[in-house]
C-alpha cells in the first residue's frame, strides 16, 4: 500500500529566518512557525487557544528566498514533509533526534504591510513542464445533439476555470 508524508501549514513566523550554507554551498534556512487552534471549552464555556510551534527547514533557492523576504510575524503557507534527523549532542556525545518539516513549497501571505509583496509562491524544485493539450484540427461546426444534463461529465472539464 502507498504511504503519504505531507504537511501543510499556515501560520506566522516566530523569529527571523536563520540562513546558513553547507560546505558545498547549498543554502539552508531554518524558521519557526506558530499555528494556533481555538475552541470553546464545553465545561466552562470559555474560549480556549493553543499555539503549536513547528520547526521548518528549507534548502537551496527556497532557503535563499525565505531568508531574503520572510520576517518575524509574517504569515506564510508551507507545504512539505516530515523528516526526523539524528545528531550528536556536542556536550554529552549522546544521540539526539529532531523532527522537522522539510519545505517543498512556500507562499508568503498578507499584503505589503505584512513585510513583503502581495505573496509569491516558491517551489524548491523546478516544476515539470506539461505538454500542451493536443486539440484536434477544427472540424466543420455542426449543432451538437441535445443531451440530458450531466449526461457526459467529461465535457464539463473544459468549462472549469481552474
Curated annotation (Swiss-Prot):
Molecular function via GO: single-stranded DNA binding
Region span, Disordered: 108-162
SSB domain span: 4-110
Alphabetical list of InterPro entries matching this protein: NA-bd_OB-fold (IPR012340), Primosome_PriB/ssb (IPR000424), ssDNA-bd (IPR011344)
Example of a GO cellular component annotation carried by this entry: nucleoid
Listed CDD domains: SSB_OBF
PROSITE patterns: SSB
Annotated GO biological process: DNA recombination; DNA repair; DNA replication
UniProt motif Important for interaction with partner proteins: location: 157-162
One Pfam family hit: SSB
Record carries keyword DNA damage: yes
Keywords: DNA damage, DNA recombination, DNA repair, DNA replication, DNA-binding
Biased composition (Low complexity): 128-151
Keyword DNA-binding: yes
Extent of Gly residues compositional bias: 112-122
NCBIfam families attached to this UniProt entry: ssb
Functional note: Plays an important role in DNA replication, recombination and repair. Binds to ssDNA and to an array of partner proteins to recruit them to their sites of action during DNA metabolism.
Complex formation: Homotetramer.
Protein name: Single-stranded DNA-binding protein
Species whose genome carries this gene: Bordetella parapertussis (strain 12822 / ATCC BAA-587 / NCTC 13253)
Taxon lineage: Bacteria, Pseudomonadati, Pseudomonadota, Betaproteobacteria, Burkholderiales
Gene encoding the protein: ssb
